[in-house]
């Protein structure tokens, strides 16, 4: 798999906002899945904001969710 395919697969999982799809992607690549539901979604939404080509409607949803749950918008 080349990097373009990897990024496409990653974005499809994250941008879907379907927990099962995101978890399947994480398991495939041995990425830690937080047990805490809010921490899981905070990571997804922070990822969406960190990716420059994220769809604008997802960026807005991410901002609203993070702000509404008391999380910073940045990953650091």
Segments (PLM) and residue ranges:
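Long, non-catalytic architectural segments outside compact domain cores
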Residues: 1-46, 50-67, 71-76
């Amino acid at each position: 798999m080349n990097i373009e395919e990897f990024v496409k697969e990653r974005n499809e999982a994250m941008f879907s906002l379907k927990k099962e799809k995101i978890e399947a992607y994480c398991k495939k690549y041995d990425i830690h899945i937080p047990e805490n539901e809010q921490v899981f979604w905070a990571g997804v939404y922070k990822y969406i904001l960190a990716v420059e080509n994220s769809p604008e409607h997802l960026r807005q949803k991410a901002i609203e969710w993070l702000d509404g749950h008391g999380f910073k918008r940045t990953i650091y």
